[in-house]
Amino acid sequence: MRSPRTRGRPGRPLSLLLALLCALRAKVCGASGQFELEILSMQNVNGELQNGNCCGGVRNPGDRKCTRDECDTYFKVCLKEYQSRVTAGGPCSFGSGSTPVIGGNTFNLKASRGNDRNRIVLPFSFAWPRSYTLLVEAWDSSNDTIQPDSIIEKASHSGMINPSRQWQTLKQNTGIAHFEYQIRVTCDDHYYGFGCNKFCRPRDDFFGHYACDQNGNKTCMEGWMGPDCNKAICRQGCSPKHGSCKLPGDCRCQYGWQGLYCDKCIPHPGCVHGTCNEPWQCLCETNWGGQLCDKDLNYCGTHQPCLNRGTCSNTGPDKYQCSCPEGYSGPNCEIAEHACLSDPCHNRGSCKETSSGFECECSPGWTGPTCSTNIDDCSPNNCSHGGTCQDLVNGFKCVCPPQWTGKTCQLDANECEAKPCVNARSCKNLIASYYCDCLPGWMGQNCDININDCLGQCQNDASCRDLVNGYRCICPPGYAGDHCERDIDECASNPCLNGGHCQNEINRFQCLCPTGFSGNLCQLDIDYCEPNPCQNGAQCYNRASDYFCKCPEDYEGKNCSHLKDHCRTTTCEVIDSCTVAMASNDTPEGVRYISSNVCGPHGKCKSQSGGKFTCDCNKGFTGTYCHENINDCESNPCKNGGTCIDGVNSYKCICSDGWEGAHCENNINDCSQNPCHYGGTCRDLVNDFYCDCKNGWKGKTCHSRDSQCDEATCNNGGTCYDEVDTFKCMCPGGWEGTTCNIARNSSCLPNPCHNGGTCVVNGDSFTCVCKEGWEGPICTQNTNDCSPHPCYNSGTCVDGDNWYRCECAPGFAGPDCRININECQSSPCAFGATCVDEINGYQCICPPGHSGAKCHEVSGRSCITMGRVILDGAKWDDDCNTCQCLNGRVACSKVWCGPRPCRLHKSHNECPSGQSCIPVLDDQCFVRPCTGVGECRSSSLQPVKTKCTSDSYYQDNCANITFTFNKEMMSPGLTTEHICSELRNLNILKNVSAEYSIYIACEPSLSANNEIHVAISAEDIRDDGNPVKEITDKIIDLVSKRDGNSSLIAAVAEVRVQRRPLKNRTDFLVPLLSSVLTVAWVCCLVTAFYWCVRKRRKPSSHTHSAPEDNTTNNVREQLNQIKNPIEKHGANTVPIKDYENKNSKMSKIRTHNSEVEEDDMDKHQQKVRFAKQPVYTLVDREEKAPSGTPTKHPNWTNKQDNRDLESAQSLNRMEYIV
C-alpha cells in the first residue's frame, strides 16, 4: 500500500477548537450548524476503478484479477440543494470536503467511530432546508503530481434530515465497490429548530431577561415579556395609555397623571373639592363652586357648624347662620353659660369660662383640651448611648445597651468580666467596647476566627486551598503561575488564516478576519446574503462577518420573521378587537391604526358587532385564527412510494431510492455509468441494474472468470448462489430485490410521526416533517404559542395547536385582555353619587347625607365634642363611660366614675382642675403599704353616697355585694377606691343603657381585712328595666368564669350577694293584745281576761314557726337563674319549684349591725364556692329548731360541698357565695 499523502482536512483537535470558537462567536461567524459524514466501511474486492482498470494498473493474465497493489482510498463529498433528478455537475452549494487516505481495497472502521480521519464536517451559515442531495465519491490516490487521481465509485442520495445528535446510516450497494457511511446534522450552540436558524442565548441584562427551552424558545423570566423579554410587565391594572414601567410590577405615570395605576388625572393646582377627567381640570363636586371648587354652597350640610342643637341656614357660598336654642349663643352656638360647672378639666386642671365655652389650664405634667394626656417624660430622650427610655409616672427609666450602665446609661460597663475573648492573651476594657489581644493565627473581636491564608492570594478567579500557614492556587484553564497570574498565549501557533489577526483571550483565541473572509479561522469566503436569509420582503446587506436585514415596518427580528407588536413599545389605544391606535409622526392626525395581530401572521382581522371578530386567511391557511396550513398533500400526488412534504399552498415529493422527478414518476437509469465490463449489456432495474455478460465473463459487473458471486454481489447480508449463467441472492428478513437492496418493511411503518407529521425514510432511519405548531424528533412537542406573554393585564394564555387564547383576569376583556371593563357603565351609584371605575370594581363617592358601598344608606348628622368631629354611629370611651354619636346627639352611659387615684409628692398635679391629691385614710388602704398613694378630692364637691341601706334590695334599685380577695395575688399599695374604680371600668357597665345613672360605692369590711362591701344603685329607672339586677348577675358570671384580663377579677376568692333579713310576722300581736287587755279591764272580767290571754298566746307560738318555712321558700325565687350542677333528687326529695313564693322579698346585704345579728336565726343561706372549677351550691342550714334538734332541708344540702361550709356564724346568714 502506498504511503498516504499529506493532504486532507485539519485534525480533530483543531476542528473541536473551530466548533468552540464558532459557538462563542455565533453572531460573528454566522455559522448555525454543520453537516457531518463519517465513512464506516469499504468493499472493493478486486481493487478496481470505476472504469474497470486496476488501481495499480496491472491485471493477472490468467484470471484477470488485479495483483500488484491495493487502492489508496479516500472520499470526496458534495452537498447541494435537493434535486429530484440528480446531476453530477453544478456547484456544491451547501459545501464540500474530503478525507485523507483512510484505507485500501476493503476496510471496516465501525469499531473506531469518532476517528477524525474518516469524518467530514461541512459547516453552514444558512437556514438548514432539511431536504438535500448528497454526492459521495470514493477515489484512489496516485501519490504523485503527474498521474491524476482516479474514481473508484460514486453514490448519490436525496432525502430529508432534521438536526439531531443521532446518526443515519446509508449504503452504496451498486457498482464496482460497496461502501457504508452515516450522516447527521447538528446545530451549533444557542441555535435551535429544524433549520438551525432559531438563535437563543440565555441572558439577564438590559437587552433581555430570558432562558431557552429545548426547542430554542425564549422563556421570559418572571415579570418580563416581549419578543426579547426586555419589556417589563407593569403592575396589574396599570393604564397602558398613561403609565409605563421599566421594572416588573412598577407603574410610572406620565406627566399629569397619578394613582397606583396611573389612571387618575392630576387636577388643577389648588383645586379643593373638585375632580378631573383630563389633567389640570377642576370639575366641582356636589354643593361646591368657584374656580377652584373652594366655595361651599352647602356649608351647613358639609361642616354642621352649629353646636348644641343649633339650627343652621345657608346664606351664600361659604356663609351660614346659626339659630341657637335657649341658653346658648355665639356664631356657632358654642357659648354656654356656666360651662365650668361640670368640672370638665381633669388632673387638677383649672377651668376658665371663655366666650367659646371653657379653657383648661393644666397642672404640671398634664396637657390636652381637658388635661387628660400625661406628658411624656421621655421626650426628649434622657438616656445616653442608645439607651431606651421607658416613661413612668413623673419620671422615667433607662434600659441600657450591654456596654453601658447607670441611671441614664452614662457609665461604661466592663465587658471583660464576661470573658468574651476565646483565643487571646488578654482582654482590655475600652469605652463602650473591649479589645482582645489575639494569639497568632486568630482574629475577630473575640479571637474566635481562624485567619484564612488564602485571602487575596490567587488571581484570575483561581480557587485557593488553605494550608497550614500557607496556601495553594488551583488555576482555571488558560492561566498558570504560583498565583495564576500568567495568561497562556493561545495565539503562539498562529492559527488564523488568510491574513487574519489573532487576538489572545482567556483559554481561547479569536481571529479578526479581513474584509471578505469569515469563519473561526478566517477560512471561509462566503456571501452571507446568498441565499437570502431575510424574510417578508426584507432587503439583505452583506457585512464583513455578518448580514443585516432591513425589516418592513410591521416586522422585526434578526431575519424579519416576527410580527412587530407596536404596543409593547408604544402607547396604544384599543379601538376594537382588530384595531389599535398608536402615536405616529408619519400621519397628519398623529395616529396610525395597526392590527391587533389576533389573526396571527397568516390572516387579516375583520371587526364584527359586539366586540367580536373574524379572520380572513391568506392562501394556504384556514382555521379560526388562520393557524392551520391547508394540507396540499391530501390528494397523494407523489408516486412510486414517494413522500409528500406539505408547504404553504404547495408541496414537494421526496422520492424513494431509484425514482426521481417532480412526482417521482421517473425510474433512475442505473445503467447511465456503464457498470458492465467486457462488453456486457446493462439492463436498468429499480434502484439497481443487471449485466448480461458475454465471452465467459461472470459476476455482477462481468468482472470475473470464476464465479457469478463475490462479497459485494448481494447486499444487506444476502447470500449469493452461482447458477452458472447468472446469480441469485437469498435475502434476509426485511429485504428484497435482485441484490437485496429494497427494504421490505419501511422504517416509517407504522408511522412514528405524531400530530400529522410526515415520515421520510432515510436509509435505515427516518425523519419527521412536523406540521406548523409542532416540534421535536417525532412531532410530540407543541410549540409554545404563549411565549412570550401575548396577554396583557395578567391574562392567562391557553396554548393551542399553532394558536393561543387569552383568558382575561377579572375586570378586563378583549382578545389580548387590553380592554379595561368599565364597571361604572351600569350607573351603580345612587342619589347622584360619583362613580369611579377601578380594576374589576368601582367606588362610589357619596354626596353629604349618604353612605354605603352604593350610597344607598342615609346617614345621620355627625357630632362635635371636645373640638373633634365624630361620625354618626361612632363610639368612644370617656373615662369609665362609653359614648356614641346618634344623629348629631352625644349619648353616654351614666356611671359615676368616682375620685381618681393619684400619687403624692409629684412635681405636677395629676388631678383634674379644682381637685388636689389627698392622702388616703389608713382604713382605706386595702393592700399595705399605701405610702405615697392618694385620691383626687375637691373641697367644694361632696362625695357621692349611695342611697342603698342595709335593708335595700332589687325593688329598691339597690344591691349589696361583699368581695373576698386573695391578697397574695394583689400588688401592694391598692386602696379601696382603686378596687372600686376598676369595678366601674368593667366592660359590662359600658353597655348599660344611657337612660340610667349608675353609682358604685365601696367600703372596707370591719370584721375581715380581706373583704370589701360594694353598694350598687341606680336612678332614673323606668318600669320596664332593672339594671342593678342585670349588673349584679353579670359581675357574678364574670367572677365565676374568671372572664376578662383584670387582675382584680383573678384575685377574687368569693362573692356574696346578701338578702335583707325577713321581718317577724308576729309584730301585729302587740296592738292586738293591748286592745284585748283594754276590753278586759273595762269589763272587769279577770277570769275571762286570763283565759283570753292564754288563748291568744298559743296561736302566737304557731305563728312564730311559720316564717321559717316561708323564709325557706323565699330562697328559691332568688335562685331561679342559677342551676345547681351537683343537685340530685332522691326519692324523698320535694321538687324545688314547690318552694317558690312570689310574695317573698329579696335582700342582698351583708351587715354587722347588732340588731340584724340577733335576727340571723330566722335567715337561710345560699352559697356557691369555687373548687377546682366554679360551681354554684345552695346551702340551707339552721343552728337549732325550737325543738332543740338541728334541721337540714334535703333539697339544699349536698355532702360533697359540706366540707367547705363556713363557720356557724357565717352560716347563720343567707347569702350568695361565689
UniProtKB/Swiss-Prot annotation:
An MF annotation (GO) of this entry: Notch binding
Matching Gene3D superfamilies: 2.10.25.140, 2.60.40.3510, Laminin
Effect the entry attributes to changing residue 577 to R: Heterozygous mutant mice exhibit mild peripheral neuropathy. Homozygous expression results in embryonic lethality by midgestation
Topological category with respect to the lipid bilayer: Single-pass type I membrane protein
Cell compartment(s), UniProt: Membrane; Cell membrane
Extracellular topological domain residue ranges: 34-1067
GO biological process annotation, one example: morphogenesis of an epithelial sheet
UniProt tissue specificity: Widely expressed in many tissues, with highest expression in brain, heart, muscle and thymus.
Annotated region (Important for interaction with NOTCH1), positions in chain: 199-207
Organism: Mus musculus
The protein, known as: Protein jagged-1
Transmembrane segments: 1068-1093
Signal sequence interval, chain numbering: 1-33
The organism's place on the tree of life at top rank: Eukaryota
Primary site of residence: membrane
Keyword field: Calcium, Cell membrane, Developmental protein, Disulfide bond, EGF-like domain, Glycoprotein, Membrane, Notch signaling pathway, Repeat, Signal, Transmembrane, Transmembrane helix
A UniProt-annotated Pfam family: EGF_TEN
DSL domain mapped to chain residues: 185-229
Biased composition (Polar residues): 1188-1199
Chain ranges of the EGF-like domain: 230-263, 264-294, 296-334, 336-372, 374-410, 412-448, 450-485, 487-523, 525-561, 586-627, 629-665, 667-703, 705-741, 744-780, 782-818, 820-856
GO CC, alphabetical: adherens junction; apical part of cell; apical plasma membrane; plasma membrane
Region (Disordered): 1181-1218
Subunit structure as annotated in this protein's UniProt entry: Interacts with NOTCH1, NOTCH2 and NOTCH3.
